Regions:
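An acidic/histidine-cluster motif and surrounding catalytic segment
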Residues: 1-100, 112-154
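Short active-site segment of divalent metal-dependent hydrolases/proteases
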Residues: 105, 109-113
Length: 154
């Protein structure tokens, strides 16, 4: 089950059914089924609080992923700061929707075991995000007229 909730912030405009289908397709491409994934959309202040409390880090971030996966099933809690998503969209000259989808899939990629701790693994993570984003019809991200998801192919 994939759930989308908020923590004292307005829910972003998402077609949860389509996004869930996309997440499942990407997970399957990495050899995983989907267990329970909870996406929690929050503010910068809340993600800073989570970062301090659970990770001992005293800085803002766009995403924190708590991984409860098994060898065959991805599960976890994924906190996403919508404030940072908005800032990053401006910084990287992307639409808010595209950046939000990038961060959503970034969390899933962590659940599949992908890392981004070195320049090399960070670059590989970006390539994998781009590949997953290319599977989403551009209209779904607000960039064209057709609103269907493309199949996700390896």
């Amino acid at each position: 089950m994939i759930a989308f909730t908020t923590d004292h912030i307005e829910m972003p405009a998402l077609d949860e059914r389509k996004v869930s289908r996309w997440i499942k397709a990407v997970a399957a491409d990495y050899g995983f089924s989907v267990g329970n994934i909870n996406y929690i959309f929050c503010s910068d202040e809340r993600i800073l609080e989570v970062n301090r409390q659970f990770l001992g880090h005293d800085y803002y971030t766009d995403i924190i992923t708590f991984d409860y996966s098994t060898p065959t099933t991805v599960s976890g809690d994924i906190y996403i700061s919508l404030d940072t998503v908005r800032s990053n969209a401006e910084l990287f000259d992307a639409t808010y929707d595209r950046e939000l989808h990038r961060v959503i899939i970034h969390g899933l990629l962590h659940l599949t075991g992908q890392q981004d701790k070195t320049p090399e693994t960070e670059a590989e993570m970006h390539r994998k995000e781009d590949r997953a984003l290319s599977a989403v019809d551009s209209s779904y991200l607000g960039e064209a007229s057709n609103d269907r998801l493309k199949p996700y192919d390896s």
